[in-house]
C-alpha cells in the first residue's frame, strides 16, 4: 500500500518538474511558489525512498553473506553493519510514512486567536488576560509577530474578549489545537475562605485567508455601524465615531474593532476578522462532508469541547485530548508551551497517518 502511494507521488514529481521546466511558469507567481513548495516536498520523499531501497539491497546482500561467512571476525563486522542498516531503514520507514501525510497548506498562515470569558465572571476575564500574556510570551519564543485586533477590558482586570493575530513560521500548525474550552481552577484574590473556584474561557483559532483567496462577501449583506470607542484602565478614548461594528446579516456574525484611532483602520481590521470567520464556516462545511471516520473528525477544533484544565493550587496542567498531565503550570503560563503544542502536533499527525494508511 505504501509503495503504491510513493510511486503515485513520484509520478507527480515528474509532472511538477516538467511544468517547472516551462519558461512560462514564472508568469503566474502564485502558481510558481506553490509548485516549488510541492517540488521540495516530493523531492525530499524521493531522496528518502531511494536511500531506503538502496539500504534494503545492502541489507539483503549482507544477510546472504553472513549465511556463508566462515571467518568469525568478519562475521561480527557483518552483524554490526546489519544492525546499523536495519536501524537506518526503520528511521527512513518512519520518515517516509510521515512524508506521506502532506504538509497542511494552512500551516504558515497568520492565525487569528479569539479568546472569550465564559463561566466564572470576573475570574474568567482575568484568565483571558493570563492566556493572552501566555500566548504573547510563546510567540516571542517562536519569533512570531503579534498584532491586536480588538479587545473588551473587564472592570476588575483582564478581558471579556480579546482578539489578536499571530504570524510567522508554522503559526497555525502549532496554534490550531488551542481551539476549545480552557478550564481554570484557582483561588480568586477576593475569596476569603480560600476555596477553589472553577472558571472557563473559550478560544477560537482561525487561519487568516490568503490575499488571493476568494471570500464571498456581498456589500449589501453587510451592515456597518460606527460609534465612539470606549476604554478602561487609562486607555485612550476617542471623541469621534472611530469604532466600527460590521454585521453579516445572512449569518448573523458580528465583528467589531475600536483599537485604532482611525475609523478606516478599524474597518480594515474588522473586515479581516469577518473574512476569517466566513472562511472558517466554509472550511467546517468541507470537513463535515469529509468526516466519515472518527480519525478524520479528531481535532476538529470544536470550541465547545473542554480541551485543557489549568489547576493553580496543584501547579498542574492537563490536556484531556492526549491525556497529558504536567506539574509545571508556572512555566507554561509564562509562555513555555513548546512541549504541549509539540505533543499535540505529533498526536494529530499520527491520527492523520492512520487515515492515510487505511486509504
From Swiss-Prot:
Origin, by domain of life? Bacteria
User: Where is it chiefly localized?
Assistant: cytoplasm
Q: Which UniProt keywords apply?
A: Cytoplasm, Methylation, Protein biosynthesis
Gene Ontology cellular-component terms listed: cytoplasm
Q: How is it modified after translation?
A: Methylated by PrmC. Methylation increases the termination efficiency of RF1.
Q: Name one Pfam family in it.
A: PCRF
**Location within or outside the cell:** Cytoplasm
Keyword RNA-binding among record annotations? no
Location of region: Disordered: 287-311
Q: Which positions carry N5-methylglutamine?
A: 235
**Polar residues composition bias: which ranges?**
289-299
Q: Which GO terms describe its molecular function?
A: translation release factor activity, codon specific
Q: Which family does it belong to?
A: Belongs to the prokaryotic/mitochondrial release factor family.
Q: What does this protein do?
A: Peptide chain release factor 1 directs the termination of translation in response to the peptide chain termination codons UAG and UAA.
* Name of the protein: Peptide chain release factor 1
Recorded source organism is Protochlamydia amoebophila (strain UWE25)
| Gene that produces this protein | prfA
Amino acid at each position: 500500500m505504501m509503495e503504491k502511494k510513493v510511486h503515485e507521488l513520484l509520478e507527480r514529481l515528474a509532472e511538477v518538474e516538467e511544468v517547472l521546466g516551462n519558461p512560462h511558469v514564472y508568469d503566474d507567481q502564485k502558481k510558481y511558489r506553490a509548485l516549488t513548495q510541492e517540488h521540495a516536498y516530493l523531492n525530499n520523499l524521493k531522496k528518502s525512498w531511494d536511500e531506503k531501497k538502496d539500504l534494503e539491497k545492502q541489507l539483503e546482500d549482507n544477510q546472504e553473506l553472513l549465511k556463508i561467512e566462515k571467518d568469525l571476525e568478519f562475521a561480527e563486522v557483518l552483524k554490526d553493519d546489519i544492525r546499523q542498516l536495519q536501524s537506518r531503514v526503520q528511521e527512513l520507514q518512519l520518515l517516509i510514512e510521515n512524508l506521506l501525510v502532506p504538509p497542511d497548506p494552512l500551516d504558515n498562515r497568520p492565525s487569528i486567536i479569539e479568546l472569550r470569558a465564559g463561566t466564572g465572571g470576573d475570574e474568567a476575564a482575568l484568565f483571558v488576560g493570563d492566556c493572552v500574556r501566555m500566548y504573547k510570551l510563546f510567540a516571542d519564543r517562536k519569533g512570531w509577530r503579534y498584532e491586536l485586533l480588538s479587545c473588551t477590558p473587564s472592570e476588575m482586570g483582564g478581558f471579556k474578549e480579546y482578539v489578536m493575530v499571530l504570524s510567522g513560521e508554522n503559526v497555525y500548525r502549532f496554534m490550531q489545537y488551542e481551539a476549545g474550552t480552557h478550564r481554570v481552577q484557582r483561588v480568586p484574590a477576593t475569596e476569603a475562605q480560600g476555596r477553589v473556584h472553577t472558571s472557563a474561557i473559550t478560544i477560537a483559532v482561525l487561519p487568516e485567508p490568503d490575499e488571493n483567496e476568494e471570500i464571498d462577501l456581498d456589500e449589501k449583506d453587510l451592515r456597518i455601524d460606527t460609534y465612539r470607542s470606549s476604554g478602561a484602565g487609562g486607555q485612550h478614548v476617542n471623541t469621534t465615531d472611530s469604532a466600527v461594528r460590521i454585521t453579516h446579516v445572512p449569518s448573523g456574525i458580528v465583528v467589531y474593532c475600536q483599537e485604532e484611532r482611525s475609523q478606516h483602520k478599524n474597518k480594515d481590521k474588522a473586515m479581516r476578522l469577518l473574512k476569517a470567520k466566513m472562511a472558517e464556516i466554509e472550511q467546517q462545511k468541507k470537513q463535515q462532508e469529509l468526516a466519515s471516520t472518527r480519525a478524520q473528525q479528531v481535532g476538529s477544533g470544536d470550541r465547545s469541547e473542554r480541551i485543557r484544565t489549568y489547576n493553580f493550587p496543584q501547579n498542574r496542567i492537563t490536556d484531556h485530548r492526549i491525556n497529558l498531565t504536567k506539574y509545571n503550570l508556572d512555566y507554561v503560563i509564562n509562555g513555555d508551551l513548546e512541549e504541549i503544542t509539540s505533543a499535540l502536533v505529533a498526536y494529530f499527525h499520527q491520527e492523520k497517518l492512520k487515515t492515510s494508511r487505511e486509504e
